[in-house]
Structures are given as C-alpha cells and as structure tokens.
Amino acid sequence: MDPEPTPLPRWRIFLFR
C-alpha cells in the first residue's frame, strides 16, 4: 500500500503486530 518500494511494508508490520 506504500507508494515507495519498501523491503517490509508498514501495513505488513501492523498485521504482524
């Protein structure tokens, strides 16, 4: 969902939390 190509999307981190 992030415009910039990140190695670990923030939305994924939130899901893991």
Curated annotation (Swiss-Prot):
Keyword set, alphabetical order: Leader peptide
Transferase in keyword set: no
InterPro entries: MGTL
Tree of life domain: Bacteria
Function: Makes mgtA transcription sensitive to intracellular proline levels. At low levels of proline this proline-rich protein cannot be fully translated, and stem loop 'C' forms in the mgtA 5' UTR which permits transcription of the downstream mgtA gene. Osmotic shock induction (0.3 M NaCl) also depends on mgtL translation. The distance between the mtgL-translating ribosome and the nucleotides which form the downstream stem loop 'C' is critical for mgtL-mediated transcription of mgtA. Cotranscribed with mgtA.
Family listed: Belongs to the MgtL family.
Annotated protein name in UniProt: mgtA leader peptide
Species this protein is from: Salmonella typhimurium (strain 14028s / SGSC 2262)
